[in-house]
């Protein structure tokens, strides 16, 4: 879904120091989206909504102890509902 460079940009990180932590998070996003919403990309192309949800998930999972996690979780919940609805229309 994201390259390591894109993930670092999303997380606003410089350097490769945390790549060992970031790689598994990147790999976990697509199966998580499919398990929670039934969404899988058409021809490997993710919808803008799925990409946005993935970005927020990456932030939540990486910065799990941040004070804004409740806000992030609410946004993610709304995005996942919308993604499930989008899948239902396809």
Functional labels for PLM-detected ranges:
Residues 1-90:
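Divalent metal-cofactor coordination and adjacent catalytic microenvironments
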């Amino acid at each position: 879904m994201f390259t390591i460079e894109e993930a670092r940009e999303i997380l606003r990180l410089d350097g490769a120091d945390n790549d060992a932590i970031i790689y598994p998070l990147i790999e976990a996003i697509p199966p998580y989206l499919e398990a929670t919403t039934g969404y899988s990309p058409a021809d490997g192309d993710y919808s803008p909504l799925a990409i946005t949800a993935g970005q927020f998930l990456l932030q939540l999972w990486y910065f799990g102890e941040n004070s804004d996690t409740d806000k992030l979780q609410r946004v993610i919940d709304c995005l996942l509902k919308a993604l499930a609805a989008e899948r239902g229309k396809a």
